Amino acid sequence: MLTQIINGKIFTPQGWIEDGSVVIRDSHILEVTNCDLPLTGAKQVDARGRYIVPGYVCMHAHGGGGRDFTECTEEAFRSAIAAHLKHGATTIFPTISSSSYDNVKQGIAVCEQLMAEKGSPVMGLHLEGPYLNPKRASDQFGDKLAEPDPAAYKALVESTDCIKRWDASPELPGALEFAAYLKSKGIVATISHTEAEYQEVKDAYEAGFTHVSHFYNGMPGFHKCREYKYEGTVESVYLIDGITIELIADGRHLPDTILKLASKVKGVEKTCLVTASLAYAGVDAKDVDDPNIIIEDGVCKSRETKQLVGSVATMDVLVQNMVKAGVPLEDVLRMASETPAKIMGVYDKKGSLEKDKDADILILDKKLRIRSAWSKGQMIEGI
C-alpha cells in the first residue's frame, strides 16, 4: 500500500523541502521528493502546510500512561509505550531502574517479545542501575544499589540481545571493567548518578563510557571546598569532546539558560533530549499511589526530601520547551530524532526521513503539537 504525504514542509538531513512529498510503502519510506504531484494508486494525506518531521527517539523513559517499565509485565510495557507513541516517540528504549535480578530477567523477556512483533516501536532495553553511587542516587532506587558484579552483569548480557544501554557510576570499584565489557558487546555504557571528578571521567571515557545520563542532574558541577574551587562532573564532561549527553527539557529539571548552554557547547551532534519520565507521563495525574513520590510543580519529587526523581513529560513537550528556550527548531528536531538514533546505533533505520528507513513520521502544527503520526507506516490512533 502506498501513502503520499503532501502539502507540508519536510525536514530532512539536508534541510527543509517545500511543496514536496513523503511516500510510504508498507512500513518503510519509499522516497522523499520535492515533487508533490499525486502518485497513481497512492492514498494522499494533506499536511495542510504543517511540518513533516521524523518520529522522535526516546532513549530514556521509566514509564507512562500510569504504568512503570520496572513492573516488568507485558501490560505495563504496552500501556507505557502506547502513551509515549501518542506523543511522538515512534522509537523507544524502555528503562528499567535498579531491581532484582529475577525482575530484570522478566523485563528482558517482555522486551524480547515486543521487539519481535511486527510494527513494534521497541528497539531495545535501557538499564539504569544497580551500579550507582548511593550518594547521588535518588530515593526511587531504594536499597537495590550495588557495586558492579561481573558474574551478574555478564549473565544478563549473555542471556539476551535486547540490552542496548546500561548506566553506572564510573567511580565505583569495577565500573571501568564493566564499561569495557559493555563496549565489547556493543552496549552504550552511560555515566549516571555520579560524583566523578575530571580524571575519573577521563578514565571512564577511555574505558568505554561514552554517554552521560540526564546531564546536570544527579551529578556535581563547579564547587568550592574551603578556599579552593574545583570542577565537577559537569565541567569534566564539557571538556571531553567524544562524550554525548542527554537533557531533560521538561522545564523543571533544567532552566532555559542551561538547555541553551549545554546544547551550544556540546553541539547538536552530541546532545539529545530525553523525558526520563515516570509512570505519570501522558496522563493527567495530580495524586499518585506511590508512597515515595508526589507530583508538584509539574514534576515528580521524593515525598520525603522533595528531591527531583523524574519527569511527567513526553517527547513533544521537550521539543516545544527547547524551542521556547531559544534553540533553533532544526537543531531541536535533530536532538529529538537523529542524535539519539545515532547514539543508540539505530540511525540506519530511524531518526530521519530518508529512503528505505522505517516510516516513522510526525505532522506538527506551528505550535509543534502533533496532528498526525505514523510508526513503521501505521497511523497512530488517538492523536
Segments (PLM) and residue ranges:
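Active-site core of metal-dependent hydrolases
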Residues: 158-283
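Alpha-helical scaffold segments that flank or form the walls of functional sites
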Residues: 50-52, 59, 69-121, 143-159, ...
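Divalent metal-dependent hydrolysis catalytic cores, especially in the metallo-beta-lactamase
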Residues: 62, 78-107, 120-133, 160-171, ...
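His/Asp/Glu-enriched, well-ordered alpha-helical/loop segment
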Residues: 229-247, 263-275, 280-364
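Conserved, mostly hydrophobic/aromatic
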Residues: 127, 182, 212, 322, ...
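A conserved glycine-rich beta-strand in the N-terminal activation segment of trypsin-fold
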Residues: 15-24
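Active-site gating loops and adjacent loop-to-helix segments of metal-dependent hydrolytic enzymes
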Residues: 82-93, 133-160, 203-244, 284-309
